[in-house]
Amino acid sequence: MKKIYDLSLIERNYVAENTVELIFTKPDDYFFKIGQYTFLDVAHKGENKIARALSIASHPDEDILRFVMRISDSDFKTRCLEMKKGDSATITQATGNFGFKFSDKEIVFLISGIGIAPIIPMLMELEKINYQGKVSLFYSNRTLAKTTYHERLQNFNIKNYNYNPVFTGIQPRININLLKEKLDDIYNSNYYIIGTSDFIKTMKTLLEENHIDRNHYLVDNFG
């Protein structure tokens, strides 16, 4: 039987329009890798599960667990918004293998919406190890107000880091001209694509049409 871990809510924050961050205690025996996800269950004792898979938005070195989500009227989201400091929840063991491939290639993140969640600990790790290679983040949202962690993303202390917010309400979407303008070499990069199914399909088509090697990009679907 898979182990279940007990959590307690520390705080709930609004981090963008219609977007909430939940910060929980982290059990001493809970371990995970950057880029993994878990199932967060916010049901009360005796209730059926009210759970959802969420990427872990905190770094393994932190003594908390952070999750971030768009608000909706689903049972899970409604319960999350009702939670108060000290309320309990549970999580499963972390799973997933969406992680770095370190090489001499530029790291390129192509992200939309709440797909930014696992990117935060990735950037924290690059900052921690004093990464010297080039890192470019292209982050697509309809407006600035919907851009989760915008201020934090501007302030990572990574030597060759470039943050490129894309506001599709007033700008063209991420396209090959933008990539060619911002990247040293589109063919000498490792791409990490996270977002909705439609966003992923668009980004994969963009890379395929420009003959980017399939081995040079990794995909994580946020539904």
Residue ranges: model-predicted function:
Residues 2-85, 141-143, 170:
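Ferredoxin-reductase
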